[in-house]
Amino acid sequence: LKPPDRKSSSDSPDTEISPVLLFQTLQGFLPEFIQRMLVVASENATLTKSSFPQKLEDADHSERVVEFATPSYLEALLEQNSYAKYDAILFCPDTERPFDFVPYVHIISKALTPQGWIFWVTRSEPCSADLLDRLNDVNMELYVIWDAMPSSLVASPQPFSWVRRTRQDEIKGDPVLFHCLAFVPKNYDPLAHARALLLDGAPGPAFNVLTFVPEVYLENPPVRAAVKAEQALCLLAWDQAASDGLTLPRFHLAQAFFAQATAADPHCHLAYCVQAEFWHRLGDDYMAARTLRSIQHVAPQETTATQLNTYTSHPAVPTKPWEPPEWNEGTSLPRILLITDNRPNYGLDVLYAGLFRVLGADHVLEFPHKPTLHGGQPERFADYPCCFCLPGEAVTLEQVCDELRSGRFDLLLFGDVERTLEREQALQVVRAADRIPVFLLDMLDDFRDNRPEVCDWLQLKHFAGYFKREMLTCVSYGNGVFPLPFAYPEERMPTSFPEDRPYLLFWAGQRQFGIRKLALEYLERRFNVDFSTRYTQAEYVSILQSSHIGLDFSGFGFDTVRYWEVPAHGAMLLAERRPTCIPFDFTDGESAVFFDDIPDLEKKLLYYGTHKEETIAIAHRGYDHVKRYHTATLRAKHLLGWIAQTMR
């Protein structure tokens, strides 16, 4: 895989470089696979092994060796009859005059291992024709470029900070102090390198190698899929070798790579196989088998079939039934402060609207002020049905803290799990709320337990309770954790429906996550349909209300807006069965229809496409079910019921 020849230019101010400081800053990006390294520095440089980053010698899987040489000694060193080859050779700049790397290219390439890298720190033009020609003569090529940016441009305690270029031909508009260039053999294959490290029992360095793959390589979809799937495989191998209880965080990261791999190539079997094995490690063989049955139905492979046969197919049972206690208003209503984020957030915003309706304007306040809750229009996410016209004025941080200290609020809901609020502001709010319970409200696309990280950020010992949208049925999250999926704003639910629904099946949306792309492309071929049409929000609602069946897949978060939106608009929900806890969920075949995998989806489409009366009846019951259990107001009452139970 060869990127096109590219050239770039950059201004390099004449800034003195300390080799010791250089070494200290290099530790942020040197590849972890390096076991033996030669450092070449000028005669005038004060350089010792102790200057080099300790991480090269403290890695778990092997000892690192760092050797030093001056340019005048280099050729003699490499002409010795026997010496161990190096994983990397680093050329440092002279502090007094330009260091010419080019004359040494012909002698150092033979001192490298087959996967070895050369690093060169220079103020010179990164892609000069002379350099590229000399590299070509010894079968080396430019791989990665880092630019040293002044600390005035990049927040750093050092005088400069390294910034990796997204592309080799990227032109920096800001001044660049100097560059670090990485060169590799022309036949260098990062996937083969990573797999060799993985088979050698080093999943961390294997994963690290893949983080350096240049973006230009990843523009090829099959290559991107292979790299992302291999990164997920490294995480799986890492998890299999560990016993630290961190399977859930690793799976969360692996799921992101699964989404990227299958978006680039929906037939990438390795991505599905790794995803399935992570489900198995969490104790959910049912999800593991479902994942593999989908890819096997579309593009069967023998090795995938072998893995599929190792899984049992029994659905995971929730650790306990989830039915929120009924909330009774009583004589006094709780006064709630909700700490929210600074952009439209469907889960938080719909819940706020529900709390507003249940408690009234005097009993619920958001901070910071979010205009989209009060008639403002967002620049992004405008198509999500979570904009409201509720009364409310902006308040300052000082006002919020004063009201907390004066006892205006009975509890605090912290919903900014992404921590968009400045930390010092968040700490001021939490300190002012030291006499009331603090609950964590986690509406992210994230099935990890985020309590420890947010507790640490807020300097809290614990939360009074944890409300979580993405709560896997196969995982025990401990006490004080309650499932709180999305809901649907009741004012957006139509009260009448068209007599004629001319469309059988509706889908519109992103294809990136889960089995979406695999399934949609299969259905388009199988039924000669097209799901690529894009709609305005008004067109979207109109066509959804004119369709008998609304199709829904899990996203990066398993809970989706469409899961509630489809039945709320009177269409039959045909949805991928969720692996998450959903109180008062739809009943399969009664108020919705669930499918486990692509063959199951195909079978149910064929059936309900020819049984319109059943489809209509299920759609009506689904609409009634949303109105009975899953409106914004009802979700707010579920939350309040659990809070009341917790605070007794």
Q: Model-found features: residue ranges?
A:
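Residue-level recognition of tetratricopeptide repeat
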Residues: N220, R224, C268, Q301-E302
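Conserved beta-strand signature within the Rossmann-like core of class I S-adenosyl-L-methionine
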Residues: Q115-R123
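A short acidic, Gly/Pro-enriched loop at the edge of an enzyme's catalytic core
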Residues: L77-I89
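A short glycine-rich, Lys/Arg-flanked "PGG" loop and its adjoining helix->strand segment in the class I
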Residues: V102-P114
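Conserved acidic donor-binding segment of nucleotide-sugar-dependent glycosyltransferases
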Residues: A592-I598, Y608-K612
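A charged, aromatic-enriched C-terminal amphipathic alpha-helix characteristic of glycosyltransferases
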Residues: P315-E326, E613-I643
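Nucleotide-sugar donor-binding catalytic core of glycosyltransferases
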Residues: W327-D588, F594, T633, K637, ...
